[in-house]
Amino acid sequence: MIGWQINSAVTMGNRRYLLDTNVLIELIHGNRTVINHIIDVGISSCAISVISVHELYYGAYNTPSEKYFIQEMNRIKMLLSRFKIISLPEMPDDYGRIKTSLRLHGHIVDEFDMMIAGQALFYGLTVVTNNLKHFRDIENLKLEDW
C-alpha cells in the first residue's frame, strides 16, 4: 500500500531513472527497498513511462473483485500523481534499432519492454527493473535492480 513520504526536493547525483512496471507494482504495495531507493535518489530523479501507466491500469482491470479493483485504482492514481509521466517521443529509430538487433541475435523481448527501453535511451534514463533479463540484451541501455 502507498503510504510513504518522499521529499521531492532531495536529489542525489545527476542520474535519472525510468521505473519499470514491476518496480511500480512493488512501490504500490509498499516495498521498503524500492521506497528507500526513491528517497535516496530523490523523487524528482524518477519518472514513469506512459507504457507502464497502461500496464498498471490493465492489471487493475484484471483484479478478482470490485473491492480490490477500487483499491488498486486508488493506489495507481496516488502513484501517478507523484511522478513525472514520460510520453512516447518520436523514437521509431530507437525502437526499430532495438527490435532488429535483438531479433538478429535470437532474443525475443516484450514489445512494451522495447518501447520502455527506447524511451530510456531517447531521454538518457536508467531503467529500474527487477526483470533485468527482459532488458539486458539491449545495447547501451543502463539498468538497475532495486
Segments (PLM) and residue ranges:
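Short, well-structured N-terminal submotif of metal-dependent ribonuclease cores
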Residues: M1-S49, Y58-R75
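Flexible glycine-rich beta->alpha loop in the catalytic core of nucleotide-sugar glycosyltransferases
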Residues: H29, T126, K133
